[in-house]
Amino acid sequence: LLRQTNNGVNRLASKGNIILAVPNTWLQLSVIDILSTLKEQYICVKNLQEMYQKIRDYPGSILLIDILSFERSYWDIIECLKKEDPDLSLVCLISKDKLAYVHSLEEDDACYLVEKEKADQMLLPALTRAREDQQKRLPTLNKKEVITLEKDYKGFSNGISTNLSRRSFLKASAVTAVASGVIASNPLATGMKALAVGESPVAGNEEKLVSSVCRSNCFQCCRLYAHVRDGKITKTTPAAYPDEIYTGCCLRGLSLVQRTYSPTRIKYPMRRIGERGADKWERISWDEAINEISKKFMAIQSQYGPQALVVDTGSGNYGLVHGIQGVVTRLANSIGCTRLNICYDQATGYGADRVIGGGIWLWGNEPRTMLDSKTIIVWGSNPINAQPQNWRIIKEAKNKGVKVITIDPIYSATANKSDEYIPIVPGSDTMLALAMMNYMIEHDLLNVDFMKRRSTAPFLVRKDNGKILRKSDFLPGIDAAGDDFYVWDSIANKPVLLKEGPEDVAIEGSFLVNNVEVDTTFTLLKKHVQQYTLEEASKLTSIPVEKIEYLARTYVDGPTTIYTNYGINHYLNGHLWSFAAFIMASLTGNIGVKGAGFAGLYVLHMPVNFAAVYVTNRKMANNTLPQAIFHEVVKDQKWGEKPYPIKAIFTMNSNSMSNFAQQNVWFDDILPNIDFKVVVDTEFTDNARYADIVLPAAFWFEVNDLRVSYNNPYMLYQEKVIEPLYESKPDAEIIALIGRKMGLGQFFPESMVDTEWIKVLLDSDGFRRMNVTYDRIVAEKVIRVQGSAEKPFIRGEHFFNTPSGRAQLYCENPLPRVNFGQDLTGIIEKERLPYFRPPAEAWKDSPLFAKYPLVFLQELSRFRTHSQWYNTPMLRELDPEPLAKMSREDAKARGIKTGDIVEVFNDRGRAVVKAEVNDSISTGILSIPKGWQREQFIDGCFQELTNTEVDPMSVNFAYFDCLVDVRKV
């Protein structure tokens, strides 16, 4: 219990309630000095064994621990501590430069982080809040004890508001502690200024801060300060956005210095001298490299045709000049080459586009809108790992009373921090959405007003051809702009055109219009989803009937936001889930309104002048060859029945060999048939190791660039921090060198450096109307270009990007995302409404299930974004090697223990790694977190296991639609 000493400082009444586990003698004495000044009692322990014993002896204690000073990993220590005493409160001492290592501990409500350098300011507040947590766990106290506790606590608070977040409490009480003289006499006080998260750091006399931005494809776009001393970057810290809620940085952003100065960075142009993949290279000059590359590119195109050169870009850099959307497109168009059509993470947006339009990227709200939700359903996503700044917003919403529910096959970190976790059978998400929709319709849980005003529910569909009835059906020759949709006026009891403004419209019924039989789109939808009962859904998803019913009613009781990304789209049926989910939102009015809709991917649609950068007077690149059939075309040297020789690959901002499905097709089909392969990168990735020439790219801090953000409403300027290291060059400069050597100097004048390209990109009427100019972005570094903190952007608030401006409940003309000659027989008609189709392979009824009974997943790690950061020392220390994570039941059945070397295998390939028995993994699932490179496996690679089969409509790699088994080596 809390008690109060004569000087007003709180202390614990019972001896031993503070256990001190600090092995370093100097640090231990310093902490003891603080505790003595505060008249705190404590017990010192010498090692982990003694610490565990004292925790057993004194349950409900506060453990003050230097958690990174022990040989065991901090997560192992935490797990053991929780088993010994679930009510234990932790106060962890962490050096400021190691805070990134233990970022996840901040999410633990019973754990407080204290910077060693500020222990004199932060320790007392941390201990006080830890005690407050303990009191919440105590049995009910009698009235007298409660009054005593309240009096004691008020005696300390001295005006500090207790209605604060944990972070705010520590900040505020540290200031008060200094002001009240509690620690003024402490010899450890150094006079350092405490820096609040989100405030601009203070640079030292010899240090300067340069505004930067992380440009990876986690879609977070964290704004950073690069700290520069003596011409070198010393660290990165979060830089404030004007709207504080978007300020933050994760482990990856904090470790960017190590990526910049990586000892394994590609430093010079290199030419292969051994077999591909042998990792034997010779250094060559830039002149030699550019001459050889341009000469071979021109020779190959001259002999085999312009399509024989493939320009391959991925998502490794979202800068508008040097990244995947930048000057590389100008080169591709100038030489009329083949540009691979991306086949990863396309299905979610493809399904959403059928309902709300706008293409495959424009479907999410500004993340701030989640603060206005009543419920947030995190469906098939793990933002704590994948998008930590979005998680901060979800957590803030949760702290304000918003309910957070996670639906996921894996008990993820996000599931752990949610109010409710609903496990689901992998690949059955569409079935769940359809059953929820059926239940809502059956029980009249719909927003009929929204359906009438803002959806196509009242539109009439012809029974003879499945098309929506329009004015042009009876008046041929009307152009699209003058066409209109028929609805049924329920008051006048007749068909009318929508623009005539019917008094009321029928959303259900079958009618006859000029001898044409029609149904409303909602009638078709209602009849269609009746087959998806709760009982059938429960059987296929493993979710109890009453839980599905509860989930449906909770969703309807909005406003509700569904937070999702690309987990579900990694199955062949992925687009059908988003198709169903967006229709479900449209039936219930949970879209286009405050606090409702979808979050996870918010993309700005900005008036960037890409055309001026992309377009030349040359032949445009062919962008219709999907990555999924690339290996077939290269192997056969034909596309369908037509010759289509491909002999060279030029790759930038992509690690194709690591991230394309079924890696073995590179060794079997692609590399043997390619004459020349060039890779531009910063590290020797899988892709670079199998190149003929590699060129060293400048890193993000070594160029000027522009980023239009994902998942926040800002445009950011990347100011060059340092000059390119070694002999690296900016991507745009490399492209220009090749272009000029290929005789395209008119498209790549030497005057066009990156700052000039930025000026071109900003030269648009749209930006002029917004007062966004080059001079302004350079001066301000960050500009909000959509919405405001008071009125954040809501997708579809005023209209949807569809022909009618309404949410479409029926897709009359389903088209494949990209048409590459695939067989669509019998598919188009089925795709007009969402339906459940089991995963092609990862399903219990699959012919392969008896042989390979484990669904293979690739979790997104907090330590990597896809394959980026795969070799960063700080993060490798925390996550040193790939692991095969499996359930206790599956491991026991195979005689496997944590640490055993195992082979994960199927008919396509194998991966040899260490096993980890992990209770977050459900029975029947095996997961290897993604992003590891081939060289980091004992043998094989996780990407050997996946397959290149794609859905003919979404044309998207289905990484999770995969079965494997595992055995001990």
Positions of predicted regions on the chain:
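Long, contiguous, secondary-structure-rich segments that constitute the structural scaffold
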Residues: 731-776, 867-885, 889-969
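Two-component/phosphorelay signaling modules centered on CheY-like receiver
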Residues: 24-43
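Alpha4 helix (beta4-alpha4-beta5 surface) of REC/receiver domains from two-component response regulators
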Residues: 76, 94-113
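Extended redox/cofactor-interaction regions of prokaryotic respiratory oxidoreductases
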Residues: 151-158, 324-395, 400-406, 431, ...
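N-terminal export/assembly segments and adjacent metallocofactor-ligating motifs
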Residues: 146-507, 511, 517-518, 523, ...
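C-terminal output helix
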Residues: 100, 118-128
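Conserved phosphotransfer microenvironments
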Residues: 61-81, 95-98
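N-terminal leader/propeptide and maturation segments of large enzyme subunits in energy/redox metabolism
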Residues: 272-288, 445-545, 721-812, 878-880, ...
